Amino acid sequence: MMMNAFFPAMALMVLVGCSTPSPVQKAQRVKVDPLRSLNMEALCKDQAAKRYNTGEQKIDVTAFEQFQGSYEMRGYTFRKEQFVCSFDADGHFLHLSMR
């Protein structure tokens, strides 16, 4: 009687271990128009200069990251104050976060 329950349980365990792994998902990369990224950088520098009460020439943007529905630019002031500018998928400025 135990054998009748043992074989289906073993067969189920063997079949579960044989399932194929799911394919690796990769993020889509869209090439950003250089003019758009330069405009976003200028807007980010302008907003940071206003927030930190300094000139745009004293603002450095160091990183540009693309996410699924947005963009972020990281930077810092000459006083080493860090910030992040966020943009929507169309490149419109959303907000500036001080770090």
From Swiss-Prot:
| Alphabetic keyword roster | Cell membrane, Lipoprotein, Membrane, Palmitate, Signal
**Positions where lipid (S-diacylglycerol cysteine) attaches:** 18
Report the main location listed first in the record. Answer: membrane
Q: Does the keyword Cell division apply?
A: no
Task: Provide the leader sequence positions.
Answer: 1-17
InterPro entries noted in UniProt: YsaB-like
Lipidation, kind N-palmitoyl cysteine: residue numbers?
Answer: 18
Q: Where in the cell is it found?
A: Cell membrane
Name a GO CC annotation attached to this entry. plasma membrane
Domain of life according to the entry:
Bacteria
Tell me how this protein sits in the membrane. Lipid-anchor
Kindly provide the name given to this protein in its UniProt entry.
Uncharacterized lipoprotein YsaB
Its lineage opens with: Bacteria, Pseudomonadati, Pseudomonadota, Gammaproteobacteria, Enterobacterales
**What is the name of the gene encoding this protein?**
ysaB
